[in-house]
Amino acid sequence: YGRRRHPKKLTPLAYKQFIPNVAEKTLGASGRYEGKITRNSERFKELTPNYNPDIIFKDEENTVMNQWPGVKLRMTEGWDEDGHHFEESLHYEGRAVDITTSDRDKSKYGTLSRLAVENGF
């Protein structure tokens, strides 16, 4: 009570490291596959658009800007319907995103992954 918590040190994720430590398609990481969502399905209406001006969507979070001033989160893929992912991809349900940074600096990806985990993704 009344004491301010010190922010914990962020440890970058290693290449191919998962949180939780299971692959994204497993039950423990993402739950059961519920089926592809198409524009004409009822579940499409449940998807929530994101209009955050701090995110650069490929079709051209503030935590990224705090970590690296002047750098923005760049989402390259979210909900998708084009069929180029594996059959039960979470992209078809709107439950997966592919992200990078606006400067496309791959050395930031481990910390970016950690930021995503810390923010509930």
From Swiss-Prot:
Listed GO biological process terms: animal organ development; cell development; cell fate specification; cell-cell signaling; central nervous system development; neuron differentiation; proteolysis; regulation of gene expression
Binding of Zn(2+), residues: 91, 98
The keyword Heme appears for this protein: no
Gene Ontology MF, one: calcium ion binding
Annotated positions binding Ca(2+) 2: 61, 77, 80, 82
Domain of life: Eukaryota
Annotated binding of Ca(2+) 1, by residue: 60-61, 76-77
Keywords: Autocatalytic cleavage, Calcium, Cell membrane, Developmental protein, Hydrolase, Lipoprotein, Membrane, Metal-binding, Palmitate, Protease, Secreted, Zinc
Metal-binding among keywords: yes
GO cellular component, one term: plasma membrane
Residue ranges crossing the lipid bilayer per the database entry: none
Alphabetized Pfam families for the sequence: HH_signal
Localisation: Secreted; Cell membrane
InterPro entries according to UniProt: Hedgehog (IPR001657), Hedgehog_sig/DD-Pept_Zn-bd_sf (IPR009045), Hedgehog_Signaling (IPR050387), Hedgehog_signalling_dom (IPR000320)
Entry PTM: The C-terminal domain displays an autoproteolysis activity and a cholesterol transferase activity. Both activities result in the cleavage of the full-length protein and covalent attachment of a cholesterol moiety to the C-terminal of the newly generated N-terminal fragment (N-product). The N-product is the active species in both local and long-range signaling, whereas the C-product has no signaling activity. Cholesterylation is required for N-product targeting to lipid rafts and multimerization.
Purpose: Intercellular signal essential for a variety of patterning events during development. Signal produced by the notochord that induces somite patterning, dorso-ventral patterning of the brain and early patterning of the developing eyes. Displays floor plate-inducing activity. Binds to the patched (PTC) receptor, which functions in association with smoothened (SMO), to activate the transcription of target genes. In the absence of SHH, PTC represses the constitutive signaling activity of SMO.
Description of its domains: The sonic hedgehog protein N-product binds calcium and zinc ions; this stabilizes the protein fold and is essential for protein-protein interactions mediated by this domain.
Family: Belongs to the hedgehog family.
Subunit structure: N-product is active as a multimer.
Name of this protein: Sonic hedgehog protein
